[in-house]
């Protein structure tokens, strides 16, 4: 029983570390993408598409009047 708990705990920590490293890499990729002017244009186009159709698909919050 102890070895099973030990193994599961080890797997949990390895998974947490892997997720943390993946998140850091993803954030670095996002920062890199923001620095590229072509990628910024695509990002702005995607945002404007969400802005136009976001409320219809539930992607944008409704404004309170």
UniProtKB/Swiss-Prot annotation:
Basic residues composition bias: which ranges? 50-65
GO BP terms:
defense response to Gram-negative bacterium; defense response to Gram-positive bacterium
Q: Single GO cellular component annotation?
A: extracellular region
Please list where the region (Disordered) is annotated: 26-65
How far does the signal peptide extend, from start to end residue?
Answer: 1-22
Task: Report the subcellular localization.
Answer: Secreted
Expression sites (tissue/organ)? Expressed by the skin glands.
Per UniProt, the ranges with Acidic residues bias are: 26-43
Q: Which UniProt keywords apply?
A: Amphibian defense peptide, Antibiotic, Antimicrobial, Secreted, Signal
- The cysteines joined by S-S bonds are none
**InterPro entries reported in the protein's UniProt record:** Frog_antimicrobial_propeptide (IPR004275)
Which residues would be cut away as propeptide? 23-47
Keyword Secreted found: yes
The family database entries (Pfam families) matched by this protein are listed as:
FSAP_sig_propep
Job description of the protein? Antimicrobial peptide. Has activity against the Gram-positive bacterium S.aureus (MIC=6 uM) and the Gram-negative bacterium E.coli (MIC=3 uM). Lacks hemolytic activity against human erythrocytes.
Family, according to the entry, reads as follows: Belongs to the frog skin active peptide (FSAP) family. Brevinin subfamily.
The entry's protein name is: Dybowskin-2CDYa
